[in-house]
């Protein structure tokens, strides 16, 4: 079986402004490099029941985020996390990417998967954006695994308290 790359063109529409370290070129550089490897499977994010976001994040936070996407320009959710009109679809596709990765591995469509997404999703807390992250895609993945496949094994090589603070 092969490795899958799950990504969406909406990632480049999540704009953060000049000088911000989390830029569209982060994903385009990765995907352009990976396209040279012909043995990879390329796939798009899955559609998903957005209620899973409210199982990971406070309902008020999810509702606030959905109402916050500007029609034009940029808006700060916190001191680091910026959203733009294109962020709305990018956030949904980032979460849909982790769900597609899980389902693809579980259904043996591919051996493993890498999600090349923006905005990133591992620092957001239960009720606030943090560290460029709007939703905690990692916590959503954990929740989805527990609900759909009834197991979870998690190895986190960085500071784990963000994920654990959401999970418990």
Where are these regions (language model features)?
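Positively charged, low-complexity/disordered segments
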Residues: 160-161, 166-168
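HDAC/HDAC-like amidohydrolase catalytic core signature
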Residues: 1-156, 162
């Amino acid at each position: 079986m092969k490795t899958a790359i799950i990504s969406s063109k909406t990632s480049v529409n999540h704009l953060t402004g000049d000088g911000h370290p989390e830029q569209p070129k982060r994903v385009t550089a990765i995907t352009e490099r990976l396209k040279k490897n012909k043995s990879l499977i390329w796939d798009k994010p899955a559609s998903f029941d957005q209620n899973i976001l409210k199982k990971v994040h406070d309902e008020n936070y999810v509702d606030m985020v959905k109402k916050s996407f500007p029609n034009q320009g940029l808006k700060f959710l916190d001191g680091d996390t910026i959203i733009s009109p294109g962020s709305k679809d990018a956030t949904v596709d980032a979460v849909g990417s982790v769900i597609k990765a899980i389902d693809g591995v579980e259904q043996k469509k591919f051996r493993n998967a890498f999600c090349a997404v923006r905005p990133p999703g591992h620092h957001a807390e239960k009720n606030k954006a943090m560290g460029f992250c709007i939703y905690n895609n990692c916590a959503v993945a954990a929740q989805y695994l527990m609900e759909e496949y009834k197991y979870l094994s998690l190895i986190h090589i960085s500071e784990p308290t963000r994920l654990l603070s959401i999970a418990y």
